[in-house]
A protein has these predicted regions:
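Glycine/alanine-rich phosphate-binding loops at beta-alpha junctions
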Residues: 1-4
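Conserved class I S-adenosyl-L-methionine
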Residues: 6-15
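S-adenosyl-L-methionine
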Residues: 33-74
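Short His-Asn-centered micro-motif
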Residues: 12-13, 33, 60, 77, ...
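Class I S-adenosyl-L-methionine
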Residues: 76, 81-232
């Protein structure tokens, strides 16, 4: 939000308000949208207590609110990963709301849209699906806690940006690379001879999920121990 005069954020999937309570600290204008009246009442009570009393609470459907929204600097969605029977879902199209049907409206009504998706999702396929018919995926963030991948975040925008960036976070450790170098090709990072006494490096969960092994090898000056190995 650096350089923006009056940035705003809209959380279309408010829930318990945890996400918006953190993001609202960075902006003067924030809106929380949630269908369940009970959760809205909880949000109205909690927001002033945690120093984000400026957050506007809207009790209603997030998708319907998007349709009548003018513009917001930033839109956030954490689509529900449950089907009508309560079963867990992973695919974007199976989550509610379905971002694939809203992506063009989201990017036309915001400078940036952040979508939180299942860490089980194939991010390569997600990029293909989200970019189908348009070019909107700008960043991918893979977030791990204690070496367990917890969140997969996609930054969408109609604002042109090359190349696509991937950010891998594990606790206090962070690594970034461009999509063009996020390949699992091992041809030029294989080390045929392993010297006794050298360190053995195993990438963390976010890096393994990203598959940016070539850029990792270049950045750390290491070689894979075998052609199809992810140990360095």
């Amino acid at each position: 939000f650096i350089g923006l005069s009056a940035p705003s954020i809209v959380d279309l999937t408010g829930g318990l308000g945890v996400d918006i309570s953190f993001m609202a600290q960075q902006v003067p204008y924030a809106t929380y949208v949630e269908r369940q009246e009970m959760l809205c009442d909880i949000a109205r009570h909690n927001f002033p207590l945690i120093q984000v009393g400026h957050v506007k609470v809207i009790c209603g459907d997030g998708e319907a609110y998007l349709h009548r929204l003018g513009f917001s600097t930033f839109i956030f969605l954490d689509p529900a990963r449950r089907d009508l029977h309560g079963g867990k879902t992973v695919a974007i199209a199976d989550c509610t709301p379905n971002v694939l049907t809203l992506k063009e409206e989201l990017t036309s009504k915001s400078l940036y849209t952040l979508v939180k998706l299942s860490p089980m999702l194939d991010w390569h396929q997600a990029v293909i699906d989200l970019n189908d018919g348009c070019d909107i995926v700008r960043e991918i963030h893979l977030v791990s806690v204690k070496n367990e991948c917890k969140e997969l975040l996609f930054v969408l925008s109609s604002k042109r940006q090359d190349p696509l960036k991937i950010y891998c976070v594990n606790d206090d450790s962070a690594f970034s690379c461009a999509l063009s170098s996020a390949s699992d090709g091992q041809s030029h990072i294989f080390q045929e001879t392993i010297n006794p006494g050298d360190y053995l490096y195993e990438p963390n969960a976010s890096l393994m999920k990203a598959g940016c092994f070539e850029q990792l090898a270049v950045s750390f000056g290491v070689k894979a121990i075998a052609v199809n190995s992810h140990l360095f």
